[in-house]
Amino acid sequence: MHKSPAKISPLFDPKFTPPYCPNTNCAAHHDSHRFEWFRHASYETRLGHVPRFRCRACGRTFSSSTFKPTYYMKRPYLLEPIARGLVAGSAQRQLARSLSCSHQTVSRLAARLGRHALLYQSRALAGQIRITEPVIYDDFETFAYSQDAALGVGTASGASSFFLYSIEATRHRGPGNLAKRGKPIDPDPFAHGYHNAVERTLDRLLPLVPQGASLTLITDGHPGYLRGVREHPGKERVEHRIFKNPNDRKKGQARSLEARLRDAAHFASDLCHKLIRHSLADHRRETIAHGKRHCGVMERIALFMVWRNFIKHRSERKPGETPAMRLGLTDKPLGWGALLAERLLPSRVPLSESWRHIFERNWVTPELGRNTLHRRVHAT
């Protein structure tokens, strides 16, 4: 039997008040003003006293733990240390050994954290955020399952705030003869489409640009990026600036002016990609901890996204301000306790089609054979 730590932060507040009815079919689910409830007994756990409630509108009962990200968890105290470890470079089996749990527990909670991160970022973008800075778009190249099926993760980073606004995936062929000999990639909504990823990113960013203003988009001029901007319905509102990647220079040769301009323009994006490769174990060079499922890779990058935006300081040399603080979303750096304080439901937070595809794990990795989908009724 697993024993809980000696000191556990209080998970159940005796003064807790339910904010809405968790029943998605109830009229009080979306309209909290119509929500009326009364206490409906309670139960005891080894972690404390848990009060229960009943909705007057639909009669559904629920508890205070229904509104926690640890809902339905037998060991809720594992969620925060696993979140910390995943963005600190720990692989899943290393975390399992450190926390005395199964590696499957770590995998399931990593997926839960990724879904929570997608909802958290979506809620932040649906708020009062407005993009008034240039946005740098570039692909972080990685892979899942095998290197002959490469995965490009398009990142949209704020040039001055370093805020990571969006991530979008693109599955494509990897380099080399192995990829050419392999079986063709099964068609999926994320395959062979750098331009599709750019269009999905613009769909997410353009509504955040103030009315009458344009979005300054900085790229390296990849043909897929050019096509994505050219074919987007809102291309008139996009000011596309191109800083091409310079040719490789010889050893000892000074950087050209073109290279210096490109590095200065892409600094925020390059830094983001370095942090991903440094902080996530599955993206290190020549690692045996590489991701197995494309959805799993995107879930962990989504967790990195909210950590980078709301928890990590914008600069290590000048700490004190996060990217979210620079945009006015928060007034102080958040901790994992604040980020995991509230359970978010997909029925109450708008998700784009591509992010919902990842949330529900509909993106199948055919090489694996069996892919577990996310089909929960009550838990997330």
Q: Where are each of the predicted segments found?
A:
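Residue-level recognition of single "structural anchor" positions
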Residues: 1-380
